[in-house]
Amino acid sequence: MKVRKSNNKPLKRSASFTSGTKTGSKSAKSVNSGSKSMKSTKSSSKSYKKIYEEFSDSESSNSEISDNDELSDNEISDNESSDDDEISDNESSDDDEISDNEISDDDGSDNNVYEDNDIRNIIIEDINDNYSKGKFGNFHVVIMKKNGYMNATKLCDNISNKYKNKKFKHWNENKNSKELIEELSNFLKLPKNELIILKKGGTNTEIRGSYAHPVLITHIAYWISPKFAVRIGFCMEEWKKFCEQNELDYYNMLNMAKPLNNNNKEKIIQHELREKYKGVIEIKTKSGYIDLLTDKYLVEIKDYRNWKSAIGQLLVYSVYYPKKIKCMYLFNVESNDINEIKTICFKYDIVLKIYD
C-alpha cells in the first residue's frame, strides 16, 4: 500500500537560545511561569494554612485521611491548573466543604490580600463588612476581619460534640490560660482586654461570642485536641529542620523560658498586686527580673523564708530605678518573728508589707 505524501508543511516549533538557555514558544513560557507559580504556592504552605490542613487531617475520619493521602503531586497540580478539577475529594462527598484552591481564590468580596502567615487566609465568604466565615480544620468559624480574631466561643462549641466539656469559658478560667494571656499582653504591649473581644447583642446571633487573638486560638485548639497538639509538635520539628537559624532561635527561646507552676503562691500574689497597683511585672534588667514596677514602687515578692534574697534584689534593682520606693511583700509569715526583718528594712529604706 502506497502512502500519499502531504503537501502541508509541518508546523515549526520556534526556539531560540538566550545566554545558553533554550526558550520555547509563548505557550511554553506560560506553562513554565505557571509551574513557578505552583512552586510559590507550595512554598507558602509553611503558614497558618498548613496547620489548619494538619488540624483537618487529625479531626477528620480515617476515610477522609485516606482520600487526602491518595492525592499525588501531579493530582494537586491538576487541581490548581484546571478549572474542571477545582473540586477536591472532600467536596465531592460534602457540598459544604471547600477545597484549598477555592479558599485561596475566594477570600471575601473585598478581595483583600493577606500575608501568607495571616490567619485571615482561611476566610471563604463574608457575613457582612466586619465579619467573615472561614474554615479551621473541618469546622466553620467566624472571623473578625479588621484584626483576624476568631470567634473562640463558636470554635469550642463546634468541637465540643467530640471533646465534651471543652467550652471557651473553661479555657478562659484555666490558670495556664491566664498566664498565657498575661505573657502575650506583655510581649505585644497590648492590654489584656484587647486580646479577647466580647461581641454580644444585635440581631445576628451568628457573630456573637468572644473573639480571641490568633496566637490564643492556636493554644485553645491545642487545649481542646491532643491530636492537634501532636501535629503542632511535628510542624515545629519541620520548622527547626528548615534552616540552621530556626533551630538556633528555637533553643534560644527555650533558654529564655521560665518554669510555670500554677500552685506558686508568689506568682498569684504578683498578678493580684499588678491589678491593684496597675504596674508591670517581670521588668528585665541586666541583673534579673523585677517582680513588679509601678509609678511609685519597686516591689519584690517572697516567701518569709527568703526575705534576705528579697532585700538583696531590691538593693540591686534600685540601682536601675533609684527614684522608686523599695517595697518587700512577704507571704507565709504566719506567727514568725519579723522584728529583725523590720530593723534591716528600716536601715535600707525598704517598706515592709505582709501578705495575708
Curated annotation (Swiss-Prot):
Residues 1-114 are annotated as: Disordered. Transmembrane segments: none annotated. InterPro entries: KilA/APSES_HTH, KilA_N. It comes from the Viruses. Residues 14-46 have a biased composition (Low complexity). Residues 66-114 have a biased composition (Acidic residues). SMART domains: KilA-N. PROSITE patterns: KILA_N. Residues 1-12 have a biased composition (Basic residues). Residues 130-239 form the KilA-N domain. This is Putative KilA-N domain-containing protein R878. The lineage of its organism: Viruses, Varidnaviria, Bamfordvirae, Nucleocytoviricota, Megaviricetes.
